Amino acid sequence: SLLLWIIILTIFSFLFLIINKHHPKNYRIYTLIIQNILILGFLFFVLFNSNPFSSITPIPNEGLGLNPILQDPALAIHPPLLYVGFVGSSIYFSAAMASIITNYSGKFFSQSIKNWVLVSWSFQSLGILVGSIWAYYELGWGGFWFWDPVENASLLPWFAMTALLHSLIVLEKRNLLYFWVIILCLLTFILSVTGTFLVRSGILNSVHTFANDPSRGLYILIFLTLMIFGSVL
């Protein structure tokens, strides 16, 4: 799943490079530098702590296979939709930091990220909706919404995205709430990575916890701390 995360990160970076050509060069360069730092951090995590190509020793004669409750067509749609929503927020996280560095603010900054916020918000909303429908007909899952810790972790970035969308309208039309927009840009991706940490670390008991490892959770926690520290600076 982290490979998918990195692929989506890379795609968003490439699309930003192509689509945002009319914005200042320094702003675009700093956005891509920060985006590449994020990609590098997750690449290190995959290579040294969660390599999907590492061999299993001893080789099991018969593997356990996929968890039965995950053997559903909806599960081919639900996680990728959420991932696009989560990872899509990295673009405006990087853009917000680039905006502070280059002093590129106001309605022009709002216009540069508004469509990216709309895309990630739309995919996040669809991901939550598909997951809720699947949870409803999956026997014993608890209805449309279970208020499970991991479910709530996916909802928090959605709230931040929704607030950000409304704030961007004010910034674009009235040139107000710039610092509030910056905070929401940073907060959305931080909450997305926090959700990844909660799922991977096993720190919380959750019906969504299918693969967890405390050592992997520690790496993500360190990465998350560095992100927050870098954002504050």
Positions of PLM-derived features:
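Polytopic transmembrane helical bundles with strong interfacial aromatic enrichment
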Residues: 1-233
